[in-house]
A protein has these predicted regions:
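Short, solvent-exposed loop/turn segments at secondary-structure boundaries
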Residues: 60-62, 194-198, 230-233, 268-271, ...
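Outer-membrane beta-barrel "beta-signal"
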Residues: 347-359
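Bacterial N-terminal signal peptides that target proteins for export
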Residues: 2-12
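Boundary at the C-terminal end of the N-terminal hydrophobic targeting segment
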Residues: 24-28
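Detector for outer-membrane/organellar transmembrane beta-barrel domains
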Residues: 39-43, 208-306, 357
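C-terminal hydrophobic structural anchor segments
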Residues: 285-332, 338
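Bacterial N-terminal signal peptides
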Residues: 10-23
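Outer membrane beta-barrel
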Residues: 30-189, 197-203, 208-217, 272-284, ...
Length: 359
């Protein structure tokens, strides 16, 4: 929902729009009176998502079925003027509110933008895709009572990706060949503030091209400091990623997403990981007034570590289907099958049913 020229909207109308997501903000008139909220901005876009997740788990140590509120996000994207904007996103699903996105964006030109604050590192197409749009319910393996290391969980657990506090330079220059885009950033890193007088830093960079309509390729690099085995010494680790995507979210037809990543699992003992993940979906045209689309999906995600791999690396298989009822509002059903590398006979299973409200 977007509120334009918010300077003149009455305060009650703004509060009602934010809480209930009314189709449009009430318009003021010459006879309006009472308290007003005056905001010196051109536009505010309010959004929210609620994801209710029913899940099962084949792990004996946990209850076989459970229900949880997976995410409750409220967000506001602000355009102050053509040069200044930003975003604030909060998650209320846990015991306390958590800031997810919080940043200022300076739009110097299409080819040069500055982003300062808490935001995703420019690494991993799958991590950068909103959880309201991803084809499977979760980006990676999530099975209660287990800690499987598939592709996404490796990258996220090692903190080569995910959100971090820092400064990014990004853009897509007008007229650049193949629709070239880039992003480069320096971040506080997972060890920030915890290694005495040292200043660890995390770095990430990503470049993308679109040689054909709906066909995109990307390459990225991420680097972070690890603790050495003894003392406060730091050792640098690196990860590299290639990705490709064909198709678009919300568009009927075939949709393919894939990425391959490799890097340092632990710089202390020089172990490396290799991982890959691929999604496949096919979205139908609109089926009825209520049911906008049905999208069968399949996901393959593999994680591996050389020389003494952890017992929880392996392969994740996820068939599923999504029912869309307009916009991003959907009901999705997934069935995760986890095949650990150490013992493929110790297969884990998890069925998931998610109800998503998003606007």
């Amino acid at each position: 929902m977007r509120i334009r020229s918010a300077r003149s909207a009455p305060l009650p109308a703004l509060l009602l729009a934010a809480a209930l997501a009314a189709p449009a903000a009430a318009q003021s008139s010459a006879n309006d009176s009472g308290p007003r909220l005056r905001l010196p901005v051109e536009e505010i876009a309010l959004g929210a998502r609620v994801q209710t997740l029913f899940s099962t788990s084949s792990v004996d140590s946990v209850q076989p079925a459970d229900v949880t509120i997976r995410r409750v996000y409220l967000e506001a994207s602000v355009k102050v003027n053509a040069f200044v904007g930003g975003k604030l996103q909060m998650d209320f699903a846990g015991d306390r509110a958590v800031v997810r996105d919080a940043y200022l964006r300076l739009n110097v030109s299409p080819g040069l933008q500055l982003l300062a604050g808490n935001a995703y590192k420019p690494f991993s197409l799958i991590a950068l895709t909103s959880d309201t749009r991803i084809l499977p319910i979760e980006r990676g393996a999530l099975i209660r009572g287990a800690a499987p290391l598939d592709e996404y969980n490796l990258l996220s657990g090692l903190q080569y990706t995910e959100r971090d506090l820092g400064l990014q330079v990004l853009g897509s220059p007008t007229g650049a060949p193949l629709g070239f885009g880039y992003a480069v950033g320096a971040f506080r890193g997972p060890l920030g503030g915890s290694v005495g007088d040292q200043s660890p830093v995390s770095l990430a960079a990503r470049a993308t091209v679109e040689p054909l309509q709906a066909l995109r390729f990307g390459a990225a690099w991420s680097s972070r400091d690890f603790r050495a085995r003894s003392g406060d010494a730091l050792q640098r680790g690196h990860a590299f990623e290639l990705d490709a995507e064909y198709g678009d979210y919300g568009v009927p037809g075939l949709h393919l997403v894939g990425e391959l990543a490799t890097g340092d699992f632990s710089s202390a003992d020089e172990r490396r990981f290799t991982a890959a993940q691929a999604w496949l979906g096919y979205r139908t045209p609109r089926l009825s007034r209520a049911l906008h689309a049905v999208e069968p999906t399949f996901r393959l995600s593999v994680g591996d570590v050389d020389a003494g791999a952890p017992a929880n690396v392996g392969t994740l298989l996820t068939p599923g289907v999504g029912l869309y009822f307009g916009g991003l509002n959907r009901v999705s059903l997934n069935y995760d099958v986890w095949l650990p590398k150490a013992d493929e006979n110790d297969t884990l299973h998890s069925a998931k049913l998610m109800f998503q409200l998003a606007f």
